[in-house]
From Swiss-Prot:
Entry similarity comment: Belongs to the universal ribosomal protein uS5 family.
A cellular component annotation (GO) from this entry: small ribosomal subunit
Pfam annotation, one family: Ribosomal_S5_C
NCBIfam families recorded: rpsE_bact
Organism (species): Pseudomonas fluorescens (strain ATCC BAA-477 / NRRL B-23932 / Pf-5)
UniProt entry tagged with the keyword Nucleotide-binding: no
Domain notes: The N-terminal domain interacts with the head of the 30S subunit; the C-terminal domain interacts with the body and contacts protein S4. The interaction surface between S4 and S5 is involved in control of translational fidelity.
UniProt cross-references to InterPro entries, sorted A to Z: Ribosomal_Su5_D2-typ_SF, Ribosomal_uS5, Ribosomal_uS5_bac-type, Ribosomal_uS5_C, Ribosomal_uS5_N, Ribosomal_uS5_N_CS, Ribsml_uS5_D2-typ_fold_subgr
Protein's gene: rpsE
Subunit structure: Part of the 30S ribosomal subunit. Contacts proteins S4 and S8.
Keyword Manganese appears in the UniProt entry: no
Role this protein plays: With S4 and S12 plays an important role in translational accuracy.
Domain S5 DRBM: 12-75
Name of the featured protein: Small ribosomal subunit protein uS5
Length: 166
């Protein structure tokens, strides 16, 4: 794993996806602030992302980590991979994720890789199309993971057995 991750007392894996310097132009010159995008997960299906802004980088990262811990979702995984292939989009970013066999690893780029690693997905094939803006890619990945349901829950909603829907 990269040097961007840390283990916390609560057992969460934290990853820094992006730090960006932004400038506000005022009469006296420019005011620089920093934005941070982070993802947090327990490696067992719980994952969250957050954004933070501050005049200093460490404060922005801390705010983003706190926001990520407040914004956690539960993902229904099939062992160490996804339940089924899916597409998702946010803005101009489109992501495609599909389950992979054991031993494949996480084949995904940048921001998607960080989300999938902290979520506990170990075998997946993923591709990002359109805009590769990390914020939109993380949003799109979350939309897809949040919408994914296990076959058992789908069968229960339809009042059928798992074999009938598979």
């Amino acid at each position: 794993m990269s040097n961007n991750d840390q283990k916390r007392d609560e057992g969460y894996i934290e990853k820094l996806v992006q730090v960006n310097r932004v400038a506000k132009t005022v009469k006296g010159g420019r005011i620089f602030t920093f934005t941070a995008l982070t993802v947090v997960g327990d490696g067992k299906g719980r994952v969250g992302f957050g954004r933070g802004k501050s005049r200093e980088v460490p404060a922005a990262i801390q705010k983003a980590m706190e926001a990520a811990r407040r914004n956690m979702i539960q993902v229904d995984l099939n062992g160490t991979t996804l339940q089924y292939a899916m597409k998702s989009a946010h803005g101009a970013s489109k992501v495609y994720m599909q389950p992979a066999s054991e031993g494949t690893g996480i084949i995904a780029g940048g921001a998607m890789r960080a989300v999938l690693e902290v979520a506990g997905v170990q075998n997946v094939l993923a591709k990002c199309y359109g805009s590769t803006n990390p914020v939109n890619v993380v949003h799109a990945t979350f939309k897809g993971l949040k919408a994914m349901q296990s076959p058992e829950s789908i069968a229960a909603k339809r009042g059928k057995s798992v074999q009938e829907i598979i």
